[in-house]
């Protein structure tokens, strides 16, 4: 069950990249958000400047009738009509980590930004420098398998989550494919449910950010 904080509910889900990973992640998110009373008003923001090509129809979640249309706009319209999700399309590219950070500042203060990802140290360093003045210890790692490994990496006893985990108001997930995305989303939900029973309600994030594109910069 997805649980959340009454004092600080999730209000935004931002997906960067609507291609092979993003196009198959968005329907999972849209269905999840609209199936719960307390998340049905969460805004699902889709960011991608690319258009649908014929070759995309073979492995991405698009059909031939959508060729030449912007991917973010196609998915936003599809799941707004299909699931009545609060979708919003941003039809332009975010070419770098720095540009991603600038865009996200429109949603939350830099000091409130957290990170959940298992990407390369180079990306982690860039993210940490943008949003974590105190360095890497301010951020959070979450593996696609279990949240116990997250606790282990942060020097905690297996199964025990540190008070610093999810202490910020946003969560960042970097996915490498649709299977990875599904694992990470489910792990996040499980972790939020676990924390609901052991942490202060103020410890919950109010935004989830999913990076399913821009693989070339990592």
Q: Which positions does each model-derived feature cover?
A:
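Adenine nucleotide-associated cytosolic modules
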Residues: 1-218
